[in-house]
Regions:
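Acidic, serine/threonine-rich low-complexity disordered tracts
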Residues: 23-78, 94-185
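Prokaryotic Sec-type signal peptides and long signal-anchor helices
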Residues: 10, 40-42, 88
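Sec/Tat signal peptide C-region and signal peptidase I cleavage site
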Residues: 18-22
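Short helix-onset patch at the extreme N-terminus, typifying the N->h transition
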Residues: 6-8, 180
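Positively charged n-region of N-terminal signal peptides that target proteins for export
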Residues: 1-5
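Acidic/charged, solvent-exposed loop-and-adjacent secondary-structure segments enriched in E/D, K/R, S/T
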Residues: 79-88
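Bacterial N-terminal signal peptides
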Residues: 8-17
Length: 185
């Protein structure tokens, strides 16, 4: 039996359509009860969703809201980040798709900060349990009006509906990271 000549072209077109649709992510929060354990030992538990906020709780700490899977309020050090989140409006990044970018500025303490958040790419990387998983890499470039610079990166896993890794560094030599090492459902 001979296959029609157009079949390879049709197959390639369909495969491309499936791949492209797999590289977007609608906003979603982790399922309630899911526990994320970081390399530092800190654990957070998903509690539900309220609009673009995921309701979360730090084990041994308190509840917080995670806006657009990126920014927590209150922050881990207890600071209210409402004004910062309102200025950035990170929910505009959703649905996630490589190449999408938003910009914002924020004034505080007599200074102005400019932010560019971008969905840099869709990539496979090592995740919890050393498994290869699909992620979206989001970068936030922050510049201050006095030459300050920093970059933050989140790797959001569609399968977990959570950032499985976060990295931060600035022009003053400060750096931080948080890596999810275990997920319990």
């Amino acid at each position: 039996m001979r296959l029609p000549a157009f079949l390879p072209v049709l197959s390639a077109a369909l495969l491309g359509a499936v791949t492209a649709s797999a590289q977007t992510m609608e906003f979603a929060c982790p399922d309630p009860g899911t526990t994320f354990t970081y390399d530092s030992g800190v654990k957070v538990v998903a509690r539900g969703r309220s609009g673009m906020d995921c309701n979360m709780e730090r084990v041994g700490g308190g509840p917080f809201k995670l806006r657009a899977l990126l920014f927590d309020n209150p922050s881990a050090d207890g600071n209210d980040t409402s004004a910062f989140i309102a200025a950035l409006r990170p929910e505009r990044l959703w649905p996630l798709e490589a190449g999408k970018k938003i910009e914002a500025s924020y004034k505080i303490g007599g200074g102005t900060w400019t932010y560019t958040l971008a969905v840099v790419r869709y990539e496979r990387r090592t995740g919890p349990g050393d498994k290869m998983i699909d992620t979206f890499l989001i970068e936030m470039n922050e510049t201050g009006d006095k030459g300050q610079r920093s970059i933050s990166r989140w790797w959001i896993a569609p399968s977990d509906k959570f950032a499985i890794r976060y990295d931060f560094s600035d022009g003053a030599g400060k750096a931080n990271r948080a890596v999810v090492t275990q997920i319990t459902r």
